[in-house]
Amino acid sequence: MSALQKYPRISDMVMPAARRLPAFVHAYLAAGTGQGQAMARNEAAYADIHLMPRFLRGRVTPDTHCSVFGKTYSAPFGVSPIGLQSLIWPGAEKILCRAAAEAGIPYTLSTVAGEDVETIGPISDGHGWFQLYAPNDHGVMRDLLARAKQAGFTTLVLTADVPGPSRREDMRLAGAPIGSRNPMSITPRVFWQCITHPAWSFAVLANGGKFRFKNLEPYSSESALENITDYIGSQLNGSLTWDYLDEIRK
């Protein structure tokens, strides 16, 4: 049975994913912030989009291609950025990027992804977009953008609406150590979720057993997750202004 036959709708994948992933990981993937009102409004807005059919036009071959920023893609959507996708499944950045390149749609790599631009850029086959959380240090910002461009990313996605750490209440309820210096601290509850989801746990161990923010490691004195987390907290604190945007354009 093909994946399309098994999961004909996106909603059909929700429950299998919930069974396969530890609860704190699934909450990170599937839930929004706070009580989830913004996420619910977004889903309602997408559900309110209607396709208007046109009849009596003879034989027509549907064409979903579209042009964005001077480049043509096979469909009017792409893969949005998710930080630390490798937490959800080891190697997820590579898996999704290859799938997007094969489908001819954009793949957007997050600043705080588990893989770096140098790894993902060549896989994207010219379809790579890079999402930037603007660092306070302009030198780091310029170097990140230079690395992304050198790696083959063609489009910049600048995130402006995250002024600070979000309230991930579903993750807190699922047992994730929210507020800890090391967000991957192994609490008894997290440990139990890991051993009761062996497929995910073995995949993580086979991938080295570590979660990393590889794009940002060159700018921190140590690569340990807790130090990178401290660095992210000090550098990515929502201080974006129009002057900063002008600096990016230069």
Tell what function each PLM region has.
Residues 34-37, 87-93:
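A structural motif shared across PLP-dependent enzymes of the aminotransferase-like
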Residues 77-80, 107-109, 128-132, 156:
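Hydrophobic faces of well-ordered beta-strands that scaffold small-molecule active sites
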Residues 83-85, 110-116:
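Short glycine-enriched loops at secondary-structure junctions
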